[in-house]
């Protein structure tokens, strides 16, 4: 069992989410970690606004490294490094996780968490992989996250200007798409890809509307093909023109 607590390196963002200051929250987090440890529950410490804050603007990667170290110092079991609003760019993701692994090289302690708001989270995933990160958080269909408001089982715009205008911006990178990406890079992962794609399609049927995965529609890169879609007559035409079956260029 595990629970999660989150801090933002930019204090205005942190205050908007928690209602308290960073120093006060750290005290509460340490108290909660001790309580959890007493009953065998692990604590995952989240660091947010690593690559920028939607409220305070630019942030320093070095601050996020310090926050990561402090989480571990007060007893967190592992760290979720979160891009909660899709601010990250691939070069900065690589730079950050290189800094993290130089400081704390145990990859089992680190989890990458990328929200999809600009259709570039797959590039961030690749950059984190290249830096050496092994663990990623994803959700089927990209569900979760902002906005937290639902009406008739559908995500709707949150209240206030802080929320995205488009309620489809509701969560993490899609598990289906990320898994296909990793699988086709030849990286071992231990998942049944076809089963995950099936689950993604079933989830869309369950919620009753289109989610964000492209892989559940377009599938994996074909290796066998679909000859039932072939235009009839190619073999006869090649024979008529005096071409061999596998000839690609004129002689």
What role is predicted for each listed range?
Residues 1-251:
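Catalytic cores and adjacent flexible loops of soluble metabolic enzymes
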């Amino acid at each position: 069992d595990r629970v999660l607590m989150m801090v933002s390196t930019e204090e205005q963002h942190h205050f908007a989410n928690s209602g308290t200051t960073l120093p006060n929250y750290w005290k509460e987090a340490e108290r909660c970690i001790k309580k959890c440890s007493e009953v065998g529950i692990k604590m995952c410490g989240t660091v947010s606004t690593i690559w920028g804050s939607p409220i305070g603007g630019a942030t320093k990667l070095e601050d996020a490294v310090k926050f990561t170290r402090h989480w571990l110092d007060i007893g967190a079991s592992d760290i979720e490094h979160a891009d909660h609003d899709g601010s990250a760019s691939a070069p900065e993701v690589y730079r950050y996780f290189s800094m993290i692994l130089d400081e704390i090289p145990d990859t089992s302690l680190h989890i990458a968490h990328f929200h999809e708001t600009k259709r570039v989270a797959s590039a961030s995933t690749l950059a984190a992989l290249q830096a050496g990160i092994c663990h990623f958080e994803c959700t089927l269909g990209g569900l979760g996250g902002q906005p937290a408001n639902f009406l008739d089982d559908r995500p709707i715009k949150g209240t206030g200007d802080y929320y995205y205008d488009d309620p489809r911006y509701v969560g993490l990178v899609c598990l289906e798409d990320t898994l296909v990406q990793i699988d086709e890079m030849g990286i071992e992962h231990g998942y049944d890809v076809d089963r995950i794609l099936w689950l993604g399609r079933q989830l869309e049927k369950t919620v009753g509307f289109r989610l964000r995965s492209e892989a559940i529609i377009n599938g994996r890169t074909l290796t066998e093909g679909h000859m039932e879609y072939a235009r009839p007559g190619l073999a006869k035409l090649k024979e008529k023109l005096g071409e061999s079956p596998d000839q690609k260029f004129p002689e």
